[in-house]
Amino acid sequence: MGIITLLANRRGLHAILSNAQRIVGCRFVSSSIIPDASRLRNIGISAHIDSGKTTLTERLLFYTGRISHMHEVKGKDNVGATMDSMELERQRGITIQSAATYVNWKDHNINIIDTPGHVDFTVEVERALRVLDGAVLVLCAVGGVQSQTLTVNRQMKRYNVPCIAFINKLDRMGANHNRVLSQLRAKLNHNAALLQLPVGLEGNNTGVVDIIRWKAYYFDGDNGEIVREDVIPEDMVDECRKRRQELIEVVADVDPELGDLFLEEVKPSESQIIAAIRRATIERTFTPVFVGSALKNKGVQPLLDGVLDYLPNPTEVKNYALDAESLDTKVLMDSRRSGEAPFVGLAFKLEAGRYGQLTYLRVYQGALKRGGFIVNTRTGKRVKVPRIVRMHSDIMEDIQEGYAGDICALFGIECASGDTFTAEGAPLVSMESIFVPEPVISLAVEPKNKNDLDQFSKAINRFTREDPTFRVRFDDESKETIISGMGELHLDVYTERMRLEYNCPVICGKPKVAFRETIGKEASLDFRPKSRVAAAGQYGKVVGKIEPMPPESITKNEFVDATVGMNIPKNFIPAIEKGFYEACERGFITGHKVAGVRFVLEDGAAHAVDSSEMAFRMATIGAFREAFNKAAPMILEPIMSVEVNAPQEFQGTVIAGVNRRHGQVTGTDANEGYFTLFAEVPLNDMFGYATELRSQTQGKGEFTMEYCRYLPALAQVQAELMDRFNVEKLKKAKR
């Protein structure tokens, strides 16, 4: 089982074992790749910001013997948590990028990815969940289900990731596990039930009760590393019986085997209940709920046991790849760790390391061996694997090979995030790519010192390669470099990293909202050049229509070739498509990008001598401009889901402030003298809200926001944007 490390007040082994209660768990120290897939777990720790994810991960590392000392996220020793390896993370006390590690617990290997909780870094959660088999959803016992919890829940659903829930921070004033359980059921639609009950709340929390194994657990030693087993307190027995029966009923509703026992009025055994919970959790029809306090070192070891008991191993999850030749054909991955099947892996994250680009990779099939050759299915390029490492935060440990189910990292591999690699000579397949949300905010940046342009370019190139939500473009008209991202914090972190990591301080312009131009109705297009003989190679006629995309695709554009016959030679169709997408890059009424438009090409004409790709591309741009102005053009703006928490005495003031910012209140919640306001507010109206909220609530209020959707902007906003655009055009025309 491992080497037991006894750290409890320097007491001897005999003294500890002579206690009246039984010692059932300590710290386990061992580390190895275990070939048996049943003893492997790939999990992520996900939650809303400040729910205690990184603190929980620090305890997981300590109790499994992976680290010898625990450090806090904002500890007095100024060391910072192990998984927050970036200097900026330790300064700000937040997780900015996901970090991977692995531990050994009771002869099982657990790969862990600690993810950010802030919505601005949501792509880190997205790509982590894409490659994981299970997750721990951390919930604050006071805050409960919050805005980013909803986002993480959607991401888990998108990738069919089973999860167990951990209600953290039971030591805090106002902690209420029952309220959080109700929110888990009502807001997230989880079929959930408690597997544990806390022994006391707030300052009186001393341990947890396991209602399945019918035992109480207390956590002794300087750091809670010794798990002491005891009988359930007498005053909790009745509630534990009630909760156990509730648990059995909830699981019996979704598990046929336990359901049969329940209908036959047969009392299920401990092992039967655990097996039923495992089946239901893996099928995502039930969510087991654990309780504890990571900061106070309570409930973490039973949570580790829960990861082994209820979350799937790689063979219990079905992963599919798409046949590269026929993307409609799905290929089931062979998750056996024998290495007999051809290798398939997904590069899910890139990071610039000390020795070059570090590519994080999940092995889905077969074996990856050092010195072997693999093929990038996107580029068709054959590459050698010079070095394979396992990551422990920012520390690398060399390994010779990785098998199906392993998460490792490669050096010296040039690729993009989301690329699939296969064995040399094997059929080409492609893993389904990672969902990447569109940026919602932009600002202009330039280096303070013109001599830093080289470092500035290096930083920009690296960050865009690592983070698909961080976009960069050069505006030809203003001659500015424009960076775009998921929020002000997202862009602030990258500009700060330029200063810290590249010694390149930058000057930032004012943030700009990513407005979009779209159309409100269908319009026909029939465009031909004014004169066929105007210039050689300049004839091209396009006929068709443009129409609005459905609401769920409002941020996308689509080109449809509906031509019949050869009026337009097929070799000119790509030029027409290129012209359409080129025209969408800069709109006609405000200069913002065009979105939510479907371009249907129905007919056209070409000339045997005077037609060219350039002619059709320019004809398409002209046709699109004419049709766009006839199709009820309008401006879309990003709407944010906003969640405000503040003392109840400020509720009226806060609601009035949100209304002034053209927000729509969607709900409120009250708890222990505080209220939570849920609203949808245009991003354009959210600038400066943090300062206003602090002023309104005497510094006691806080808020979070995340992108929700695009909606038509208010008429006044649209008019202002169009007027500003027209004024700028006039100024340029006079120059």
From Swiss-Prot:
The keyword Transit peptide applies. One of its GO terms (cellular component) is mitochondrion. Keywords: Elongation factor, GTP-binding, Mitochondrion, Nucleotide-binding, Protein biosynthesis, Transit peptide. Residues 38-315 form the tr-type G domain. The keyword Glycoprotein does not apply. GO terms for biological process: mitochondrial translational elongation. Mitochondrial GTPase that catalyzes the GTP-dependent ribosomal translocation step during translation elongation. During this step, the ribosome changes from the pre-translocational (PRE) to the post-translocational (POST) state as the newly formed A-site-bound peptidyl-tRNA and P-site-bound deacylated tRNA move to the P and E sites, respectively. Catalyzes the coordinated movement of the two tRNA molecules, the mRNA and conformational changes in the ribosome. Belongs to the TRAFAC class translation factor GTPase superfamily. Classic translation factor GTPase family. EF-G/EF-2 subfamily. This is Elongation factor G, mitochondrial.
